[in-house]
A protein has these predicted regions:
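Fe-S-dependent hydro-lyases/dehydratases of central metabolism
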Residues: 1-686
Length: 686
């Protein structure tokens, strides 16, 4: 085992001595190591472990060890992630290329089964489910069946790959969202294994084929989203080239006040970091406020790193990390390994620690966070809930001005023609009477036509999910209902969410307001919101209405959520439920009533908003380790639709397919490699 730097050391965990490349030992040679940001310490260990004198040299290690926080990035280094995560939309091409490489290997007379990922690769199928059915008890089953019909060949290919390739696993459809499954189950935090026959440990690091891979930063794991070529290189054990980055420190103090959520916090942070400008930079959170921030909140923040503009948004490992690992069913041996390694490696955070040195520092007192939304077109455009109505009306006026001027011009022209035309007399721009499901109602500009509890950004967080359920319960007790034009949906990022909603019996209240589970996948967050009811969509088109959506997602660009929905607002799950009840954006939820109870008394948001203490009590009583253990004990097996697929076996993909995404399994690009043996990468990526 190479140790040219003289930094090999040992620590004890689970009753045995385990080797590691020691940052404290390197600090004896480079004093600056002690004050490096935690994220750069992880990168530095990576360089030390893969230092080979050629691809990665002692000079590379020294350059990072002596990091200048104010220097513009110029020094290129190689980062070798420990594993790769993929989703089905961007991950399929990588597996197609592996299949094509096997074809090429076979054509050259080699052993096709030698082509395998060298680094662990795990693909979660979550990007294909759409909300075709909603608002009914069988919506989940119906959407699942439609999903399999639409993706039959792709899914058969991935199921074949699951059995054909070593070091490659597939989480089947209808299981969860990649980043939430990664957080709750796949992540190791600290890897252990043998290097040259000796027990060793090293940090869990990764790249993923999805920009929100950074959700795992909340667990203290360094990783981010990359393109397909980089992901394939990482799967084959190759390093990724990068410049030593600048690191922005984000200091958190205090506690979140009553009535606010992690969603409000992350929208505040998004606005601050967008104004700062952090493209190409790491963001690292520190400060005593971390001790009051549950890991689920940290994951929500890490998830939105792409919206910040940063490469990653990481939290250090600390007691909260261990608490979450225990809750989510990790073994006692894993917990001891993580803590022992992090402490030995100076990767463990305490409030008493001296702060690392950063390129620049932003500060936020959590007590200053207030209820917020973001929209209507960008996640960084935060709107205070108290100002949401006026802000919306101002933005709506800008959007409808041209339409209304053109309509008025047409009306004036028709009015001068005579003949009793009704255009000028009856038609109101941006409004129409609609009949749907035996109800007739006026649909107009500002109507909320989609209300979606969606995205791992928020569905990974029990506080906001149970908060939504409590609000639904309170609203139901007051006799409030969702407006008939609102398409409601609930798409959890893992089945654990369903388990604790059922245990708490809050699923009944959400379903009573139309929030039935429609799938375990990305759905509305990535634009798979499905069709609107035909009468509603036709009215929006014909009358050029400015329709709205409210979702607990992470992006809200115009047209992303639905082609006919122009204004999209990001909000916490409880606010999604509240706006579904209101049915419109031109409402002041702070001062205007949501509706009336059966006796005609006004009901305000404050009357149904969940109490923070009650949310915590629900978490303590209903979110259990046993739920995680049960759901993830068979996470790679899939349901009957997956198990019953007609899938080929063997080392080669043998199906002739018409699917464009699978056509390149016999790609001609592989044929010019020439005769002779194909060079194989070595285990250490050389």
């Amino acid at each position: 085992m190479r140790d040219e730097l003289g930094c090999l050391d040992h620590f004890k965990a689970n009753g045995k001595e385990i080797g590691f490349y020691s940052l404290p030992k390197l600090a004896e040679q480079h004093e600056n190591v002690k004050r490096l940001p935690y994220s750069l310490r992880i990168l530095l260990e990576n360089l030390m472990r893969f230092e080979d004198g050629s691809n990665i040299t002692a000079d590379d290690v020294a350059a990072l060890a002596n990091w200048d926080p104010e220097a513009e990035p110029s020094k290129e280094i190689s980062f070798t992630p420990a594993r790769v995560v993929l989703q089905d939309f961007t991950g399929v091409p990588a597996i197609v290329d592996l299949a094509a490489m096997r074809e090429a290997m076979k054509a050259l007379g080699g052993k096709a089964d030698r082509i395998n990922p060298l680094s662990p690769a795990e693909l979660v199928i979550d990007h294909s489910v759409q909300v075709d059915s909603y608002g009914q008890a069988d919506s989940l089953d119906l959407n699942n069946q439609i999903e399999f019909k639409r993706n039959k060949e792709r899914y058969a290919f991935l199921r074949w790959g699951q059995g054909a390739f070593d070091n490659f696993k597939v989480v089947p459809p209808n299981t969860g969202i990649v980043h939430q499954v990664n957080l709750e189950h796949l992540s190791r935090v600290i890897f252990d294994g043998e290097i040259d026959g000796k027990p060793m440990a090293w940090p869990d690091t990764l790249v993923g084929t999805d920009s929100h891979t950074t959700m795992i930063n909340g667990l203290g794991i360094l990783g981010w989203g990359v393109g397909g070529i980089e992901a394939e290189a990482a799967m084959l054990g190759q390093p990724i080239s990068m410049l030593i980055p600048q690191v922005i420190g984000f200091k958190l103090t205090g506690k979140l006040p009553e009535g606010t959520t992690a969603t409000d916090l992350v929208l505040t942070i998004t606005q601050m970091l967008r104004e700062k400008g952090v493209v190409g930079k790491f963001v690292e959170f520190f400060g005593e406020g971390l001790s009051h921030l549950p890991l689920a909140d940290r994951a929500t923040i890490g998830n939105m790193s792409p919206e910040f503009g940063s490469t990653c948004a990481i939290f250090p490992i600390d007691d909260e990390t261990i608490r979450y690992l225990k809750l989510s069913g990790r073994s006692e041996e894993r917990l001891e390994l993580v803590k022992a390694y992090a402490e030995a490696q100076d990767l463990w955070r305490n409030d008493e620690d001296v702060d690392p040195v950063y390129t620049d520092v932003l500060e936020l007192d959590l007590g200053d966070v207030v209820p917020s939304l973001a929209g209507p077109k960008r996640p960084q455009d935060r709107v205070l809930l108290s100002e949401a109505k006026n802000t919306f009306l101002h933005q709506l006026s800008d959007m409808t001005k041209k339409r209304d001027n053109e309509r008025n011009s047409d009306m004036d022209r028709f009015a001068g023609e005579g003949g009793g035309t009704a255009v000028g007399a009856t038609e109101v721009p941006g409004a129409a009477e609609v009949t749907y499901k035996d109800q007739t109602f006026l649909l107009k500009d500002g109507a909320v036509v989609i209300a979606a509890i969606t995205s791992c950004t928020n569905t990974s967080n029990p506080a906001v999910m149970l908060g939504a359920g409590i609000l639904a319960r309170n609203a139901r007790e007051k006799g409030l209902t969702v407006k008939p034009w609102v398409k409601t949906s609930l798409a959890p990022g893992s089945k654990v969410v369903t388990d604790y909603l059922k245990k708490s019996k809050l699923d009944d209240d959400l379903e009573a307001l139309g929030f039935y589970t429609v799938g375990y996948g990305c759905t509305t967050c990535i634009g798979n919101s499905g069709p609107l009811p035909e009468p509603i969509e036709e009215a929006i088109k014909e009358h050029e209405m400015v329709a709205c959506s409210v979702l607990s997602g992470n992006r809200n660009f115009e047209g992303r959520i639905h082609p006919e929905v122009k204004m999209n607002y990001l909000a916490s799950p409880p606010l999604v439920v509240a706006y579904a009840i209101a049915g419109r954006m031109d409402i002041d939820l702070v001062n205007d009533p949501l509706g009336e109870d059966p006796d005609g008394n006004p009901v305000y948001l404050k009357d149904v908003w969940p109490d923070a203490r009650e949310i915590q009590d629900f978490i303590q009583s209903n979110v259990t380790t046993e739920m995680f253990s049960k759901e993830y004990s068979h996470v790679f097996e899939g349901d009957e639709l997956w198990k019953s697929m007609d899938t080929p076996t063997g080392e080669m993909w043998s199906v002739v397919t018409e699917s464009p995404s699978l056509a390149s399994t016999r790609a001609p690009v592989m044929s010019p490699m020439g005769s002779g043996s194909m060079p194989m990468p070595s285990k250490n990526g050389g």
